[in-house]
C-alpha cells in the first residue's frame, strides 16, 4: 500500500530518488507482459488511436520523444514513417533498453537515437537543434517540479512550422477517490511535492523492489496550457478523452482496449491531449 507525504518545498534529492526508482524497474518492464516486447517486435506499433489521429501523418518528419522510457512509443512513430526519431530519458538503463530494442529491429542511431539526459537539459543533450514534432506525456509531467521550465525547454526544440503534441493523464482524476472516482477527496490545486513509498510497479504490482521512494507533482490543466502559451507556442487544440490506459479507479472496466467507467457511470475526462504549434 502506498503512503504519501506532501511538502511545500522540493526535496533536495528528488531527482536521485526518482532515478533510482525508475532504474530498478526497467528490467521488470523489459521482461514483463505489460510492455510485451516480443509482441512489440511483431506488431511494431503500440500508439493509441487518438494519438495517431491527432498527430497525423509523420512520414518524412523528425520526432523527438521526451521522457521516452524504453522506447516503444518512440519506435512506433518510426514504424509509422518518421524519417528520424530521438528518444530522451533520464534513466540510463531505460535508454540502454531502448537502444537494444531499436538495434534488434534493425534501426541504427541514424534513424533511431536514444539519449540519457534530464529533460530540463534536453536542448544541450539531443543531437539536433530542433524537430518537426516534439512528443511526450502519458505519465511524464508528474515527475517534473517546474512546468514552466519544461514548457520553455520543449518549445525551444520545436522547429519553425512544427508542433508539440502532449497526451497526459487528466489531473482531475488525482482529486477523486480511488474506489469509484465519484467523490472529491484531494485538493485539485495542491502544489507541494508528493512523496510516495510504494513497492512494485504499475507493470507488475507484485514485483520485488527496493528503491520505492518517489517524488511527484500535480500540474493543473491551466498550468500546462498557460506554460506552453507563455513559451511562445500556439495552442491548436485541447481535447479530453473518457478512457485511460490503466485501472485508475477500482470500478473500471476494459472496453476496446481501454480502461473506463462502466456503463451508466457519469463520465469525466481521464486523459487530455493538445497540439501546440510554432510559427
What are these regions (language model features)?
Residues 163-202:
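Conserved class I S-adenosyl-L-methionine
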Residues 62-123:
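Class I SAM-dependent methyltransferase SAM/SAH-binding core
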Residues 1-38:
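N-terminal, positively charged/glycine-rich alpha-helical extensions of SAM-dependent methyltransferases
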Residues 120, 124-134:
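A short acidic, Gly/Pro-enriched loop at the edge of an enzyme's catalytic core
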Residues 148-163:
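A short glycine-rich, Lys/Arg-flanked "PGG" loop and its adjoining helix->strand segment in the class I
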Amino acid at each position: 500500500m502506498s503512503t504519501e507525504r506532501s511538502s511545500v518545498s522540493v526535496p533536495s534529492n528528488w531527482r536521485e530518488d526518482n532515478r533510482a526508482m525508475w532504474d530498478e524497474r526497467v528490467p521488470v518492464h523489459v521482461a514483463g507482459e505489460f510492455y510485451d516486447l516480443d509482441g512489440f517486435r511483431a506488431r511494431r506499433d503500440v500508439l493509441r488511436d487518438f494519438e495517431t489521429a491527432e498527430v497525423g501523418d509523420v512520414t518524412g518528419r523528425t520526432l523527438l520523444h521526451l521522457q521516452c522510457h524504453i522506447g516503444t512509443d518512440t519506435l512506433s512513430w518510426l514504424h509509422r514513417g518518421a524519417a528520424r526519431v530521438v528518444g530522451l530519458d533520464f534513466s540510463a538503463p531505460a535508454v540502454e533498453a531502448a537502444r537494444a530494442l531499436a538495434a534488434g529491429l534493425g534501426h541504427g542511431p541514424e534513424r533511431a537515437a536514444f539519449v540519457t539526459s534530464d529533460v530540463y537539459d534536453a536542448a544541450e543533450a539531443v543531437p539536433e537543434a530542433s524537430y518537426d514534432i516534439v512528443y511526450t506525456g502519458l505519465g511524464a509531467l508528474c515527475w517534473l517540479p517546474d512546468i514552466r521550465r519544461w514548457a520553455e525547454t520543449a518549445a525551444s526544440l520545436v522547429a519553425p512550422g512544427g508542433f508539440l503534441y502532449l497526451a497526459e493523464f487528466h489531473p482531475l482524476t488525482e482529486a477523486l477517490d480511488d474506489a469509484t472516482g465519484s467523490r472529491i477527496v484531494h485538493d485539485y490545486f495542491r502544489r507541494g511535492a508528493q512523496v510516495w513509498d510504494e513497492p512494485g510497479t504499475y507493470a507488475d504490482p507484485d514485483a520485488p523492489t527496493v528503491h520505492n521512494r518517489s517524488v511527484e507533482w500535480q500540474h493543473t490543466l491551466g498550468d500546462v496550457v498557460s506554460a506552453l502559451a507563455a513559451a511562445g507556442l500556439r495552442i491548436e487544440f485541447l481535447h479530453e478523452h473518457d478512457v485511460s490506459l490503466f485501472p485508475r479507479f477500482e470500478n473500471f472496466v476494459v472496453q476496446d482496449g481501454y480502461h473506463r467507467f462502466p456503463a451508466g457511470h457519469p463520465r469525466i475526462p481521464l486523459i487530455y491531449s493538445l497540439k501546440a504549434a510554432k510559427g
